[in-house]
């Protein structure tokens, strides 16, 4: 049984997907967003090591509250722990639970066959991806996160090709992302 590194769990999320959500914050993120509200999730291999059953114990004990919601994974970057995520979502999917990944898309590796096979397996048990596009401009994105947005935008296109439901999320920060030309460019993307 795989164990994941979990930062924390929120039992009543209302902004992390449809309905009331059980929100699991994964530990580890390669991005260094200047406005990150969870910088304590950045370091991998910290947090609490938990099995899928341990993570979901609180969800199943409160299941009546989630009938129009489900489970959302966020972070950190949940796709850093792909094997654990696949095991988690496979169990939830088998039980008919709505699954959602809140991701930056930074882990997308289209040239890595192993990653792509795991991603396709994960997408079979994923109902929704909330994709956080931090900045549409490549240079501004790098200044904001310390990473290019190339893989992130490629991930968005891949999800579109696979017909995976996606909600694009974008944090509007005056002086950083709140510029008409960038918002229009993001809208056209």
Describe each model-derived feature in a short phrase.
Residues 7, 12-13, 39-40, 139-142, ...:
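Flexible, active-site-adjacent loop/turn segments at secondary-structure boundaries
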Residues 39-71, 83:
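Conserved alpha-helical substructure of the radical SAM core
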Residues 2, 8-50:
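Canonical Radical SAM [4Fe-4S] cluster-binding loop centered on the CxxxCxxC motif
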Residues 75-76:
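Short acidic donor-binding/metal-coordinating loop in glycosyltransferase active sites
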Residues 7-11, 48, 56, 112-113, ...:
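Short secondary-structure boundary micro-motifs
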Residues 60-70, 79-189:
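Conserved AdoMet/S-adenosylmethionine-binding subsite of the radical SAM
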Residues 2, 6-9, 24, 28-29, ...:
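N-proximal short alpha-helices
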